[in-house]
Amino acid sequence: MEPDLGGSAAQPPESDPPAAAALVFGDRLDVARRYYDALATAGVERGLIGPREVPRLWDRHILNCAVVAELMPESATVVDVGSGAGLPGIPLAIARPDLRITLVEPLLRRTAFLSEFIDAAGLDITVVRGRAEHSGVIKEAGGADVVTSRAVAPLAKLAQWSLPLLRDHGRMLALKGASVAEELDRDAETLERLGAGKFEVLECGVGIVATPTVVFSAELLPRGERPSRHREKKPRRQAGAPGGRGGVAGKVRRRGKSER
């Protein structure tokens, strides 16, 4: 029997999944629909999702996260920090059952919701209660291929939480908004000091969802591949000059269907 996530008889509001959901989730669309139902009922009742977000759960939350699956290597180990109601980790697990996903979340009411839904839906996801920067969490969940996060902190802070959980050459993927270029300009030196490099700003879900998901990507460089801090500083590039720190130069790379 499926557990009662909300502890009440509340029924989810009617909302048929958009056509894009069938493209993203395929034969696992029913599982995605169950996740929508859980967010719209228990998620609201427990304060994990604001009531005003319910009408846009599919587009702004579930699909917004799921399309990031196109960046994931096959059978990758993925750690989702500050997972909250399971975004983006649960949509990724539904869209890509080959991924080995761990959700890291410090609050008990959230981890309880996550564990109950995961058990009810039969998903192969690990839930770790704790803060991403704590040594116990790093010991349990570290060495990941990918660490994801969504709208939880500025890039510099996300890097402090995410990079210690990665293997060398693993990728930090932060789901961000339109201000990511400004954040990168402000925080790039801090990211480099922490060992990050190969910065990119990507768009996922192009041609699938109405508003593509903006993702900041950085790679954890092994110590021997990191730029020396003692090298002579290069002159700052003038505004509008090509290139730039990490090769981003304020440009966004759009990923179409042919790239997946």
Swiss-Prot record:
Pfam families: GidB (PF02527)
Similarity comment text for this entry: Belongs to the methyltransferase superfamily. RNA methyltransferase RsmG family.
Annotated S-adenosyl-L-methionine binding sites: G82, L87, A132, E133, R150
Spans annotated as Disordered: 221-260
Entry superkingdom: Bacteria
Biased composition (Basic residues): 228-237, 251-260
Protein name: Ribosomal RNA small subunit methyltransferase G
Cell compartment(s), UniProt: Cytoplasm
Gene: rsmG
InterPro entries: rRNA_ssu_MeTfrase_G, SAM-dependent_MTases_sf
CC per GO annotation: cytosol
Enzyme class: transferase
Entry function: Specifically methylates the N7 position of guanine in position 518 of 16S rRNA.
EC number(s) recorded for this UniProt protein: 2.1.1.-
Gene3D superfamilies, sorted: Vaccinia Virus protein VP39
PANTHER family to which the protein is assigned, alphabetical: S-ADENOSYL-L-METHIONINE-DEPENDENT METHYLTRANSFERASES SUPERFAMILY PROTEIN
Keywords per UniProt: Cytoplasm, Methyltransferase, rRNA processing, S-adenosyl-L-methionine, Transferase
One GO molecular-function entry: rRNA (guanine-N7-)-methyltransferase activity
Natural source organism: Nocardia farcinica (strain IFM 10152)
